[in-house]
Amino acid sequence: MQPKDLAKKLFSEKFNRTSELNVYAPGRVNIIGEHTDYNDGFVMPCAINYGTAVSGAKRDDHTFCVYAADLDQFDRFRLDRPIEQNPSEKWTGYVRGVVKFIQERCPEFTQGADLVISGNVPLSSGLSSSASLEVAVGKFCQQLGELPLSNTDIALIGQKAENKFVGANCGNMDQLISALGQQDHLLMIDCRSLETKATPVPHNIAVMIVNSHVKHDLVTGEYNTRRQQCEAAAKFFGVKALRDVSIQQFKEKEAELTALDGEAAKRARHVVTENQRVLDAVDALNQGDISRLGELMGQSHDSMRDDFEITTPEIDYLVELAQQVIGKSGGARMTGGGFGGCIVAVAPVEKVEEVRKIIADNYQKRTGIKEDFYVCTASQGVHLC
């Protein structure tokens, strides 16, 4: 059963009434532009046909009573008192954090509700289960309280909840694409100005996602370390963010930065070149040049492996297998925060079964882990359902 249907069904079972408000927000896959969002750079994701549904109805008090279907757990908190962490259950932080920061923007929002949350984005896969949850809860609150918040506002509140309440220093891409995604389009997002540019996905091209089932947890260490290294490099260049450094400027000072901090230099090289790759990818797509897009995806993966150092042997192997089949007809790369998670591959529809087969025949044999294979559709962002 799809999350939309399951959330409605479970709501009537758990609360003995019919839901009045149903919201759905998708997960996402990022085609190119990794670890560029928190450097004020460019990204090119699409919303996918996996996501989080919230079904609920008003209460006649100020309490939020939340049931997480996938975990079979309840959480209760009041909106007429300061919202605190619930240290025993991590998932509650995403919900409480969003409500807390909505109240910061709209202090009049104290309307209680019963709600059920159900999702089918694989957890810790790098497909943004957390952002789709935040955006779904944010939209639910906006509708519940008839609050003057745009979908962009909701996305930024979701990011703030993850940064300040959950403690993961993510950028804004995941929430923005979940809030603003367009059916059958990739969305190039300028993470500084928040401008977006939709580019259609050619109808004969498939977007495949393969979950390595090597788990990552961004709240711990490595992700936040990368962010600090990027900030240190920006400081070295005397700019607000690495977005402001061109490839030419980077090359001029690369040796100096390397002597000072070799790791920061490698991280900066990835971000500076990755921003350019996103802009080049938009041009390639507009010209229908999927071969060029694939080439850029390959360069992106190499840069994440060698300069940003966030891939794993299992992820590298999945990319290698997919690439053997795809050749110059598309591309494959790791997607998401890194240290496991998923790869994304873009190729003609007729290559899908061949890619699925080479991975099924080889990945588990080498790694001892069974992968999951998804063919995705570029989907609409958050909406009522």
UniProtKB/Swiss-Prot annotation:
SUPFAM superfamilies: GHMP Kinase, C-terminal domain, Ribosomal protein S5 domain 2-like
Reactions that this protein is recorded to catalyse: alpha-D-galactose + ATP = alpha-D-galactose 1-phosphate + ADP + H(+)
A Gene Ontology molecular function term of the record: magnesium ion binding
Any one Gene Ontology cellular component term annotated for this protein: cytosol
Pathway stated in the Swiss-Prot or TrEMBL entry: Carbohydrate metabolism; galactose metabolism
Catalytic residues identified in the record: 174 (proton acceptor)
Record InterPro entries: Galactokinase, Galactokinase_bac, Galactokinase_CS, GalKase_N, GHMP_kinase_C_dom, GHMP_kinase_C_sf, GHMP_kinase_N_dom, GHMP_knse_ATP-bd_CS
E.C. no: 2.7.1.6
Top-rank taxon: Bacteria
UniProt-annotated location(s): Cytoplasm
Primary localization: cytoplasm
Keyword Aminoacyl-tRNA synthetase part of the UniProt annotation: no
Residues given in the record as substrate binding sites: 34-37, 223
Record site feature (Transition state stabilizer), residues: 28
Keywords of the record: ATP-binding, Carbohydrate metabolism, Cytoplasm, Galactose metabolism, Kinase, Magnesium, Metal-binding, Nucleotide-binding, Transferase
Enzyme class: transferase
One Pfam entry name: GHMP_kinases_C
Binding locations of ATP: 124-130
GO biological process annotation, one example: galactose metabolic process
Protein task: Catalyzes the transfer of the gamma-phosphate of ATP to D-galactose to form alpha-D-galactose-1-phosphate (Gal-1-P).
Protein name: Galactokinase
Biological source species: Mannheimia succiniciproducens (strain KCTC 0769BP / MBEL55E)
Record gene name: galK
